[in-house]
Structure formats: structure tokens, C-alpha cells
């Protein structure tokens, strides 16, 4: 959409993830995201959620974001991931949540966003969500947290998974929305293969890929893509590991920014959509060498990509190359001491009319961390120096991280942490100059980096009751968090052009530093597994209360094209509570599943409270002439968003499973941001084959 494309590639360098039995996440789960080394979940010093395997495998998910949105405290707004209301709506330009695939960033170098349908969903083994500022570990874009997808590693025995699925869009409740005559659907064919060969399984191989097609529920908006991933690992002995990974991806897609009207919410403004054809090729190499208690890891990744615009009148084509190199040294000492240190270099070059020509960027970092573990407690201290330069304009900042964990008694774990965060604006945020229909996207080259900190205090209680037929295993977790940002960047709608007359071309979006902000809140999560007679029952739940507020609501942070001073108070639709725009105060998730004799019945619930504050200009009578229906939609959809999903699976044989599902079974309308309606109810069917 508008050429704000997201391209990425994947490198695999971590060992295979370990999850609790029967797909439910309990205290024996290990994670790598918290400290960049394997660690028991209950011993982490920060909040890390691990999605149960059943959310990945038991649901007929068309896209990986359907999995991600089940994580407690995580929301997706128009494809942008947010954690604990740390971000608003950014149109795919810039992200405060870093997306990792096997420990390497999966954000585009130009826009800093993610294209979810290119994620390796068929080979995802574990999804870890680290919450809070994580820049000391992972650098810029981890200001609000990390979502880490860990994929298959070469297996000692042959492992195969093949699936084909189709998902059909139902007609919406409002008849005028359903513009189509024939059924609309999306479908996918996926495969994943893993095995090892040779003496002592020296040679390991993983192959996986997908063909995907989406006819879309919006008029003229669809997506067709194909991708292939190959991973080779060579381990001649216990000390040395080398590997190569390649990826190719092609996508042919259309998108739309603004609706025609609320009652025509699935028809783009002026019945027009932007069309983009994207190509990517990437190659990654890694080397790991263990020398006694020391581990050396080198990763090098090269990528080339191209975006071809489908419009002559609005050329947003772009192309670029990127090089990523990182060295990590780890020293696992005696008496529970671990040392980590490393260096990072990322260089990118791109050229596009969308960004007003050619640009180059460089990112360098030095980082170090000390971890200490004893019988009942763990301590962690990390420091990172980060430097960015775009077209010769440089910025640098150190960030610090402190964390501690203490086991009060068996099953009871306390944690506390404080961490700084830092994010440099993406090239798209600084230089994008394009159009979405009659609306414009305006450049903002003078914006500054944003920084902040997060503090958290949490407790996790494990529950394990044995000796009865039912049994019980589970956990409860509570966390209080406090986050503050300086010079927070927000995507803002307003009048930024000065063409003569009253024209919509003067209005659009730009990125602005809006001053200091604060987010405080409480998060409760839990999971359990038990038996009711012969029926196995397992479930998870999460509730997040986040209060995001502006600390200087009257402070002027910009002026529009008419010279009018802009502040939080003057630009907000509802400034009465100082709530930041495009945020949810309440967010809840739940999933429950029952299994018996090859049958599995499950249900998921997702809830967001009403988005109380947006840019006031969206409801201005003048703008309503050009972008109608925003005020009407907010009046009609003012009770929040509640989605209830169901699934039914039948194991046909030892290796074949038939899965049926309904997403948004109540067929509720939702507007995740102004002038956009979420998809209606969908009904899916999937046939899967699995070996080992």
C-alpha cells in the first residue's frame, strides 16, 4: 500500500525450541528472547509470553497474524503490531515492536514494517512475545517489545507437514457492504520438510514454502504470493556449526487506505486501489564455534528487493539492497556467571520516487550483557550503544537494561526490570511523499528519534496437582508496568499541503514528534490443563489494562499548512482523559480446547474496548465531505470489538487431520482505525498431513 512495503528474510541460528507437554505452555518451557540464550520461562526477568502450540496447529489459520493476535496484550492495527498500547496507527511506517525470525530482525529497511503473509507460518515452532523496552538486547524498533518466531531446525528423524486450506468470506450484516455476487475466498497450500543425513547427522536440511491467494473482501483488493525457504546446516563435530539459508518471494497485491463511506465500507474511496508487485531474494550464512565455555556466533545476511508500482500517475516503485552482519560472543562461566558481547552493522541503499530519490542508511551497535544465576535468583545487566545515519545525518544513544528474578518458593517467582528504549525514524517516516487516492502522505524529514523506558514488577505462580485422575497443571501471572516515551512519534492526519482552493490533496498523513507520554497498566495471564473423565481440557487467558496518556496535552509540537498551532488538545477528538490516539484501554484474550478420541473442539475470544480517541479532523464537516462515515461508524460501533471463533478437528488417520473453523462467528463489524472496516465472518476448511 503506497509502496510502504515490508521485506524481510530469515536466518536460523538457535537450537530447537522446547515447549511443555501436550502443547500447553507451563513452567518447563524454555525461551531465548529474554536473554538471547536458552532460559526457563519462569526464570526470566521480564514478561515473556509463549503461545501454545495448539494456537498454531489446531486452528486453520490463513495468515500468521491470526496467530499473533491471540497473544495477551498484543493487537494488530492495519497490519501493525502493538504491545500494551505502546503504539497507535502508523500506516506500516515504523514499528515500536521488533519482529524476529530465528533471532534476526524481520522488518523492512525502508518502512520498518512487516508483510505478514511472507512469514514462514508452515514452519513456525514457537512464538515468544517479550514485553517492554528491549533496545539494549535488540536495538532500534524494540522500543515496545519483541515478537519472536522460532522456526524448524533440522530434525534427527524425517519430519513432514503438508496442508491445504480454504477460507470463505461470509456476507456482512449490513447488506450494502456486500458488493460481491459470487463467493470470495482465500486459500493456501503449504509444505515443510526437515531431516538430517550422514554420520552423526552432520548434514541437516529444512525446506518449506507456501502458495497463497486471497480474492479479498474489499473491492479490487486482493493478494497472490509464492515463497520458498531452504535451510542447510553442517555440523562436522560438537564444536563447529555452519549454515546457509536462502529465500525467494514474490507477491502481487492490491490495497486501499480509505473507504467510500461507512455503508460502503468494503469499497475503496473513488473505487480505486493501489497495485504492487514485489520480488525478494535473500541469502544468509552463519558460523557458530564453541571453544570450551565460549561460544562465537557470526551471522551475515544479504538481501535485494524490488517493488513495482501499478500506477503511472502515482509511481511508488522502489528497490534496494541490504547487508546485515552481527558477531556475538558468549562466555558461560562457572558459578552461574554468563557474559555476552557483540557488534552489529546494517547497511542499506534504496531508490524510489516515493522517498524523493535515493537514500542510504547505516546502523552500528556495540552491546554487552552480564547474567548471574544462583539457587533462587537471577540478575541481568545489559548495555548497548546504538548509532544511526541516514544520508549523512547521524544520531547515537546508549541504552541500559536491569532485571532480577527471585524464586520465593517452589512454583512462585517474582521478577522486576527496568530498561531503556530507543528508535530511529525509518526512511518512510522521514521521506514518504505519495498519494492514497485523493489523500496524500507528506514527508517529515525533521522528525527526531524517540526514546523512553519501561519498568515492570511481576509474579508468576505455577500450579501442579498430581495423584488424581483429573490432574491439574497450569500457571497464573500478574504484571504491573510503567512506560514513558520522550518525543513519541505518531502518524497524524491533518492539513499539510497548501494548494489553492479547498481540495482533499492538501490533507493527509505525516509523522510528528508529539512530546512526552506515559503508559501504565496491569496484565493478568494464565493457562491450565486437566482432564474431565476421558476428555482433556486445556486453556489460556489474558487481560491487559493499559492507560496511555499525554503528559503535556497543551504543548505545541507542530503547525499545519495554515499556520495553526497543533497540540494534543487541539488535534484530539476526545482530550478529556488525555488518552493517546488510536489506543485500546482494555484488551482480553481467551482460548479453550477439549480433546476426546480423535475429536477436538475449541473456541477463542478476543476483545478490545472502544477506541476512545482519534484525530479530530476525521470528523470535521469539511473532511467528512471527502472521507464520509467516520463519525457514523464511531456512533454505531461504540461498544468495543468482540470476536468469538470456533474450531472442530477430526483426526482421520494417524497422519491426516481435517480441520473446520469459523472466525468472527457473530459476524460483528469492527473498525480498527478510521475509514476501515475489518473483515466479516469467515468459514474455513483445512486438510493436513503430518509425519513426526
Can you name each region flagged by the protein language model?
Residues 14-55:
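Short, acidic, small-residue-rich periplasmic hinge/interaction motif at the N-terminus
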Residues 65-104:
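Extracytoplasmic beta-strand/coil segments of soluble accessory domains associated
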Residues 357, 406, 410-456, 480-512, ...:
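Surface-exposed extracellular loop regions of Gram-negative outer-membrane beta-barrel proteins
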Residues 163, 373-376, 481-484, 508-617, ...:
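Gram-negative outer-membrane beta-barrel transporters
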Residues 214-235, 239-322, 353:
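Flexible loop and strand-edge segments within Gram-negative outer membrane beta-barrel domains
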